[in-house]
Amino acid sequence: MHDIRVIRDNPAAFDAGLRRRGLEPLAAELVALDDARKAAISAAQVAQERRNALSKEIGAAKKARDEERARALMAEVARLKEQAPGLDAAADAAARALDARLAAIPNTPGPEVPEGRDEHDNVELRRFEGRGRAESGRQHFELGEAAGLMDFEAAARLSGSRFVVLKGRLARLERALGQFMLDLHTAEHGYTEVAPPLLVRDEAMFGTAQLPKFRDDQFAAQPGAVEPGAPGRWLIPTAEVPLTNLVRESILSEDELPLRFTALTPCFRAEAGAAGRDTRGMLRQHQFTKVELVSITAPEQSAEEHERMLACAEAVLRRLDLPYRVMTLCTGDMGFASQKTYDIEVWLPGQGTYREISSCSVCGDFQARRMEARFRRREDRGLGYVHSLNGSGVAVGRALIAVMENYQNPDGSVTVPSALAPYMGGVTRIEGPHA
């Protein structure tokens, strides 16, 4: 969320950031809402101060035995007391109106982010060829279904569209990928493993900016044994939500920073805007597994931490020897909370194109303000907001797709990458419905 004081101090810079996002200027509207908030608060405070002053005058009038004046003053106090709830409510409403407007505005892009309208304007940063790019091949669902290890029909009977049942060695391969990623990030990259809740409250979803704007993309979990309208919880769309909210409403010491968390979790997304896209296969599902990386830093650390996080995510694909490219997202393709984002896109021979497998974003203090996550500086004891970063390290289902398509053999089998050998119990090829 944005700081209204910063907007007031430099409205032109704020509006310029919004224009780079393709949005209309909003600084004047926000300043007007803030003026209304200040006026409402001032009116309530003036009335309270007047009541306090009149109360003292009542005491003086009674002491002077001026009963007529005392009665008049008491009547005025009663009138002000009657008005107080309305004035307080007006002040609260004005503050909520400003907060609601601020909460609906995306983060402004950093100055180095390339301008553009959509994914076609993203800028390639680098490539890794890995085992080489096969220009064609069978798609993952063709390989999985032919082997009897990937069952979309059974999943549809259980849960509807955009689900899959994995079996046998293919299920083991997916598990191996997740464990491999988690071990890499904890043992070599310095992340602390966390096993977070998969259900979170509104406040957590607001903190990372899934709410209120992206409510329709989420799965709400409403207990059946409570009264209608009672607060429920949300299935996490990404472990970014619980991991980032670990520092919610806290004051950290600068010496604690940076904090680095990782988790391997199921993720749940309604994919409300994905109708007609990637309808076959595992690329876009309501439930998928992902390893998430989250860093909490001091402001001056976040740019360097962003590059470090990207390198950690890239290391997964390099160990798996998968061809990929890194893209800097343009202003029109960035996520709502992002200040700058890198996407890693892995090569899929079956589609003959690159597809996103990781997204690494620095959010500045945008999420921290929503969460009230602060830190105390060591030199002057002053408080400041932390910076937050998040990234996929990486999406396990998409990594499975990439391994299947890039390691496929002419007979339809899939060779297990050497990096996964310690997790596969001697299995070197995926072929047919083995146990």
Curated annotation (Swiss-Prot):
Subcellular location field: Cytoplasm
Cited Gene3D superfamilies: Bira Bifunctional Protein, Domain 2 (3.30.930.10), Serine-tRNA synthetase, tRNA binding domain (1.10.287.40)
Key words of the record: Aminoacyl-tRNA synthetase, ATP-binding, Cytoplasm, Ligase, Nucleotide-binding, Protein biosynthesis
Pathway: Aminoacyl-tRNA biosynthesis; selenocysteinyl-tRNA(Sec) biosynthesis; L-seryl-tRNA(Sec) from L-serine and tRNA(Sec): step 1/1
Binding site for ATP: 269-271, 356-359
Membrane-spanning parts: none
Catalytic activity entry: tRNA(Ser) + L-serine + ATP = L-seryl-tRNA(Ser) + AMP + diphosphate + H(+); tRNA(Sec) + L-serine + ATP = L-seryl-tRNA(Sec) + AMP + diphosphate + H(+)
Residues given in the record as L-serine binding sites: 238-240, 292, 392
Any one GO cellular component localisation term in the record: cytoplasm
Key word Transferase present: no
InterPro entries the record matches: aa-tRNA-synt_IIb, aa-tRNA-synth_II, aa-tRNA-synth_II/BPL/LPL, Ser-tRNA-ligase_type_1, Ser-tRNA-synth_1_N, SerRS_1_N_sf, SerRS_core, tRNA-bd_arm
Enzyme Commission designation: 6.1.1.11
Enzyme class, UniProt record, top EC level: ligase
Gene Ontology biological process: selenocysteine biosynthetic process; seryl-tRNA aminoacylation
Principal place of residence: cytoplasm
Domain of life the protein comes from: Bacteria
Example of a GO MF term: ATP binding
Written domain comment of the UniProt record: Consists of two distinct domains, a catalytic core and a N-terminal extension that is involved in tRNA binding.
UniProt family annotation: Belongs to the class-II aminoacyl-tRNA synthetase family. Type-1 seryl-tRNA synthetase subfamily.
Function noted in UniProt: Catalyzes the attachment of serine to tRNA(Ser). Is also able to aminoacylate tRNA(Sec) with serine, to form the misacylated tRNA L-seryl-tRNA(Sec), which will be further converted into selenocysteinyl-tRNA(Sec).
Subunit structure, interactors included: Homodimer. The tRNA molecule binds across the dimer.
Protein name per the record: Serine--tRNA ligase
Upper taxonomic lineage: Bacteria, Pseudomonadati, Pseudomonadota, Alphaproteobacteria, Hyphomicrobiales
